[in-house]
Amino acid sequence: TLNKIRYSPMQGAHLSLIYRYYAHDYWAMFAHSFGESSSVQNENGWCLSGEITPSRYWKLFASIDLFSFPWWKYRISKPSQGVDGLLQVTFAPHENLTMYLNYRYKRKERDVSGTNGKITLPVYHHRLRYRLNYSPGELFSFRTTADYNHFHSLGKLPGQGYQLTQVITCRPLHFPLKTELQGSYFYTDDYDTRVYIAEKGLLYTFYTPSFQGEGVRVAINLRYDLNTHWMVIAKFGQTIYMNRSEIGSGYDLIASNKKADLQMQLRLKF
């Protein structure tokens, strides 16, 4: 069950309270809903959020989510609970220039390695993101994103990770070709501090791969609308790692520090 209450005490401000209850023995293969987990199962929680627009240029948003898992799940072999908080400030001085800065804090529980699930300890994850969107004209638009992660738990050295991504989009006015070029640099200490970098994929698809270690990622996405019926999309991306000489293992082993991917799509609409 999912229940929501929304209240607006004044113009430009509102509060929302969401309660969710997903039984641990509930199964829905393709269901998606609001929650900490990706599946609609084994989760209870309360989420309180609020947004206020003090002026035409500024917007403040804050939320806190208190959740619990009544049954065991990945990396935790007993009932557990946690908290997820978010604070975001958005500044839009002009219609073609917007930016925001947000801070996210998350605390969860995890089994201690080597104890067979008998001992659990809290883990803490701090995330900081800055994003700038700028469109100087109708031809080009730019998006800059900087992320920083900090992860720590009791009895373990803290780790950190960060990434910087620049996206350049070109939309010619009198030519039906849209080009998006994206470049990223990432560095993380370990798997827990991995970074996620969203990329524009094919039509009706989402692509947000995770990266760990040190390296760069470049991708180019081309969309050409031949006419009102035909459309072609092609995407090429390559990841280059600076801290390893091979990628993967077993049958997926790549004896190089480079990994490339190519995607294409043809659509006929009638």
Q: What label would you give each PLM region?
A:
Residues 1-270:
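Exposed, low-structure sequence patches enriched in small/polar residues
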